[in-house]
Regions:
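Hydrophobic pocket/interface hotspot
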Residues: 30, 34, 89, 106
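Alpha-helical elements of the RecA-like P-loop NTPase motor core of helicases
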Residues: 31-32, 100, 136
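Core segments of cupin and vicinal oxygen chelate
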Residues: 11-12, 22-70
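Vicinal oxygen chelate
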Residues: 1-13, 16-25, 54-58, 77-161
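Short histidine-centered beta-strand/loop micro-motifs
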Residues: 45-46, 77-80, 115-118
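Short beta-strand/turn micro-motifs at beta-sheet edges
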Residues: 6-9, 74-79
Length: 161
């Protein structure tokens, strides 16, 4: 994290992911959720060719690009790896304090039950968006090697209250 991968000479090839695209049943409801919880900013909201889509900026270099398409519903209630081509995304909290605040907001929205998993190099919580899409919020612990806690057997539930 934070280092470029596979440079050509001294040329960095990528900065980050520009956006993630997925289907929503109700774009207005989804926008409101991300605005309330993450302080998101809508930079594009378009209706064209029988569909509606938006760019929802949830953080620096982090844009969600959901589409509302009539007659097309997102998968609901599917287990991990059965949700389609995009199973989930993980949003990276700016700090431990930000992680705790976002956890509080997600619990208040009913999008998370408050449980947090310590995965060694990061804290992780799962949340559901208004379409029941399962996503994650993580906080990467400074100075902890990324390989720490990679095995599920090493993970533990932690109480942040």
């Amino acid at each position: 994290m934070g280092q470029s991968i596979a440079p050509i000479g001294s040329v960095q090839l990528l900065n980050d992911i520009h956006h993630l695209t997925f289907i929503t049943a109700d774009l207005g409801r989804l926008i409101t959720f991300y605005q309330r919880v993450f302080g998101a900013r809508v930079t594009v909201d378009l209706e064209e060719e029988g569909l509606r889509h938006a760019f929802i900026e949830v953080g620096p270099h982090t844009v969600l690009h959901p589409f509302q398409v009539p007659g097309l519903e997102p998968p609901v209630g599917q287990p991990m790896f059965h949700r389609g081509r995009l199973d989930h995304f993980a949003l990276n909290a700016a700090s431990e304090e930000a992680f705790r605040e976002l956890r509080r907001r997600l619990v208040a929205e009913g999008a998370n039950d408050g449980r947090v998993t310590d995965m060694g190099s990061l804290l992780n919580l799962s949340f559901a968006d208004p379409d029941q899409g399962r996503h994650e919020l993580v906080w990467v612990k400074p100075g902890v090697p990324v390989a720490a806690g990679l095995k599920r057997a090493e993970w533990k539930m932690v109480d942040l209250d």
